[in-house]
């Protein structure tokens, strides 16, 4: 069996540079190189390996620049033969695994430098270093696989956000993420001044102004601004019902109808009104509801004096005086005072009919139309 001393030499862990390669390193990188070479040398000495104090070690110890091997193959002219063997007696012999760990940590220093400066010295500067990694792979125990560690380390995310700590492999993704913190919105609409962080979002928004509707239904000719809207609309023609209730198996064409149905299974209404029997999930909701029976209206409009039982109703009412319409349709730009009015309006664009009759299955876009229809059955 090959002895441990024979399997690893100083040249196995040495990193050689040509003159051209050395010029590419800055001051900090050269300092790191000196530290790495000295630590490799000391690690081998500490386990009793026969080491020749090479020219590079002597120069590093004296504070001079290390040797730079001329030629394409740095290993063809070895400086080890220029100096005699230097032994350090009395050094405690570490275990094989401890030695390998120390060498692994040494290589990690190099890898750390490579990651920080966004280039790989092992490929761009000196391909011979790959042989050093391979020589260690044979003698490393399974939990110290240097090549495996190297692969996982070098693909580590190099771009880290200073705000939240999230890291990215690609600079493009990192820059795009940073905008979430800085809220930079460089893409501004020339028509209304609204700004967006991404150009694609601006392009989508501008369709509102130019009236572009590129997605046309082949069955009825109706056009839509977004492809997703066309896909939803086409369910009217195909009869597709992709939303299935896991509780009862009932299927639905529209996601809104499906969500409304699911709530009927999951919502527990434990608070019941003693006046009308209506149940509520929260006690606060029951308390607000009770005002309809008592006639209590504690919230009064300061402009017209009209009173309301809930603050939300008062806020909505005041928009009549201020003219505020915060809910705007992305399709046509029409604005509404209430969100419910916007949702009802959007159905005219999508063709959605979320209100379905339990008796005959006929669907309607407006709840009021469903109520009128149900009178036929009663």
UniProtKB/Swiss-Prot annotation:
A zinc finger (C2H2-type) spans 159-181, 187-209, 215-237, 243-265, 271-293, 299-321, 327-349, 355-377. Transmembrane segments: none annotated. May be involved in transcriptional regulation. Belongs to the krueppel C2H2-type zinc-finger protein family. This is Zinc finger protein 684. SUPFAM superfamilies: beta-beta-alpha zinc fingers (SSF57667), KRAB domain (Kruppel-associated box) (SSF109640). Residues 8-79 form the KRAB domain. The keyword Transcription regulation applies. Pfam families: KRAB, zf-C2H2. GO terms for biological process: regulation of transcription by RNA polymerase II. GO terms for cellular component: nucleus. InterPro entries: KRAB (IPR001909), KRAB_dom_sf (IPR036051), Znf_C2H2-type (IPR050758), Znf_C2H2_sf (IPR036236), Znf_C2H2_type (IPR013087). It is found in: Nucleus. The gene is ZNF684. The keyword Transferase does not apply. One of its GO terms (molecular function) is RNA polymerase II transcription regulatory region sequence-specific DNA binding. Keywords: DNA-binding, Metal-binding, Nucleus, Repeat, Transcription, Transcription regulation, Zinc, Zinc-finger. It comes from Homo sapiens (Human).
